[in-house]
């Protein structure tokens, strides 16, 4: 035995997910699989699912932040579809992005046309009735 050859080679490094490498919570591997299976293109590059997962994570965080604020404004600790609806419809950009989306159990934004409101009568100013 000359001491050459395999001598307990290096242990394989612990597997690290693509999500953790990119610093994301959303699953990059699952997004990659869905892009491949969805027949969106013949081939899918390595960076595409990372970018897609990052965009989805950002949009989700943005909506949840606004919905959490809406829940807090209504003195609630749980986000319900109504809070999601209020969050999306009160934000100009999200409303444009999700304009054609119906949120189940979301309700509508409170809105009363100005024409339907009672007219204000001019109050008499004191001191000018002489």
Swiss-Prot record:
The modification N6-glutaryllysine is found at residues 96, 119-120. The modification N5-methylglutamine is found at residue 105. It comes from the Eukaryota. Its main location: nucleus. One of its GO terms (cellular component) is nucleus. The modification Phosphothreonine is found at residue 121. The modification N6-succinyllysine is found at residues 10, 96. The modification N-acetylserine is found at residue 2. Residues 7-19 have a biased composition (Basic residues). InterPro entries: Histone-fold, Histone_H2A, Histone_H2A/H2B/H3, Histone_H2A_C, Histone_H2A_CS. It is found in: Nucleus; Chromosome. Gene3D superfamilies: Histone, subunit A (1.10.20.10). Residues 1-22 are annotated as: Disordered. The modification N6-(2-hydroxyisobutyryl)lysine is found at residues 6, 10, 37, 75-76, 96, 119. GO terms for molecular function: DNA binding; protein heterodimerization activity; structural constituent of chromatin. The modification N6-crotonyllysine is found at residues 37, 119-120. Deiminated on Arg-4 in granulocytes upon calcium entry. The modification N6-(beta-hydroxybutyryl)lysine is found at residues 6, 37, 120. The nucleosome is a histone octamer containing two molecules each of H2A, H2B, H3 and H4 assembled in one H3-H4 heterotetramer and two H2A-H2B heterodimers. The octamer wraps approximately 147 bp of DNA. Core component of nucleosome. Nucleosomes wrap and compact DNA into chromatin, limiting DNA accessibility to the cellular machineries which require DNA as a template. Histones thereby play a central role in transcription regulation, DNA repair, DNA replication and chromosomal stability. DNA accessibility is regulated via a complex set of post-translational modifications of histones, also called histone code, and nucleosome remodeling. Belongs to the histone H2A family. This is Histone H2A type 2-B. The lineage of its organism: Eukaryota, Metazoa, Chordata, Craniata, Vertebrata. The gene is H2ac21.
């Amino acid at each position: 035995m000359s001491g050459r050859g395999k001598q307990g080679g290096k242990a394989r490094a612990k597997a690290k997910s693509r999500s953790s490498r990119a610093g994301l919570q959303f699953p990059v591997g699952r997004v990659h699989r869905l892009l491949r299976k969805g027949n969106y293109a013949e081939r899918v590059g390595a960076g595409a699912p990372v970018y897609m997962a990052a965009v989805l994570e950002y949009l989700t965080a943005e909506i949840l932040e606004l919905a959490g604020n809406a829940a807090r404004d209504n003195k609630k600790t749980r986000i319900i579809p109504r809070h999601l609806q209020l969050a999306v419809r009160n934000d100009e950009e999200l409303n444009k992005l999700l304009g054609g989306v119906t949120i189940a159990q979301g309700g509508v934004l409170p809105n009363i046309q100005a024409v339907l409101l009672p007219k204000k009568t001019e109050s008499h100013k004191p001191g000018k009735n002489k």
